[in-house]
Amino acid sequence: TMLYKEMRRRGFTSVVEFQYLHHDKDGTPYAEAATMAIALLEAAAEVGIKITLTPVMYCQGGFGRPATERQRRFISKNVDEYLRLVEATKDACAKYSGSRLGVGVHSLRAVNPEDLQEVVRGTPQDAPFHLHASEQIKEVEECVATLRARPVEWLLSNLELSSRFSLVHATHMIESETLGLAQSGAVAVLCPSTEASLGDGVFPLRKYISAGGRWSIGTDSHIGIDPVEELRLLDSFQRLETHRRDTFPGDPGRFAILESVRGGASSDGSLNAGLRIGAALDACVFKASTPLVSELRSADRASTLILASGAAEVMGTFVGGNYKTAEPPSSESVAEFSRAVQKFRS
């Protein structure tokens, strides 16, 4: 709940939640398969943030390696067990306004190829499908050794990638993969703060954008949960990598905001991108009175928000037309959070 509160306070209006914990501490399946799903749905409902709840299939500890004991809480024994979890999650989502079902596997290294293809076919076709791909160089090397293809290369050759799919990170792609992913209609979900923290690498964004690729931003490990900061880091890393200042074409701030919103609407399955008459209003409201913004021409404001702004300038958010002021967490909610963390650690 605290995480979702902080995400909304900093400008997020929706979250795609990768739900990994399918079993109790000892690895025993929950009596109610959707136990953790319900907890997440209730947290999102309390905060008033939209959620695409995505149970994640994870079967092995790496290419050709069995799962470890430490992974016992999120391992699916087989496809049938995972599909039952999807159905339970779908039923739970139906009871909460502002929620929808997503599906996915962790990555090619976490499932075998046949199971991945079966999950793609066997899950609701209107549910967005997520997976990690080409996050780290070692992953790419092991994929080539096992499947005789790079991760994105394999996905392009063996799945019908489309706007249904979101590939998280996709950092280490060669040019043919970059162009193929861009032309597929799938979305690349970029998480700059996490990718920097883990030392993953830099996504080939300039080539991808030039080829018409769709993208969105994510927070992954939640080391950073400020959407403006994620866009600024994305731009900054590209500048460092390419030695150029024109990461985004045209009005860079406007382009970055609009494209990330469009990609995000595809990734979360809402397809609610931008402001449209009759549509529920999901928006972040920034202060117009701050020194950096108040004296600017309207044409310069979007770029200023991306390059020199952040969560401190967020006044509040609209989610489904309901406005909430951005306020620091109350002492009561902080105390409740501390108790929960202490209980978790005990």
Regions found by a protein language model. Name each.
Residues 1-28, 35, 332:
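Metal-associated gating/positioning segment near the N- to mid-region
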Residues 157-160, 206-290:
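His/Asp/Glu-enriched, well-ordered alpha-helical/loop segment
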Residues 23-171:
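Metal-coordinating catalytic core of metallo-dependent amide/deamination hydrolases
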Residues 280-331:
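C-terminal cap of metal-dependent C-N hydrolases
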Residues 133-186, 194-207, 221-230:
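Catalytic core of soluble alpha/beta enzymes
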Residues 327-346:
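Intein/HINT protein-splicing elements and their conserved insertion hotspots or analogous self-processing inserts
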Residues 11, 44, 103, 132, ...:
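Divalent metal-coordination and catalytic microenvironments
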Residues 122-128, 160-163, 180-189, 210-215, ...:
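Glycine-enriched alpha-helix->loop->beta-strand junction motifs that scaffold or abut catalytic
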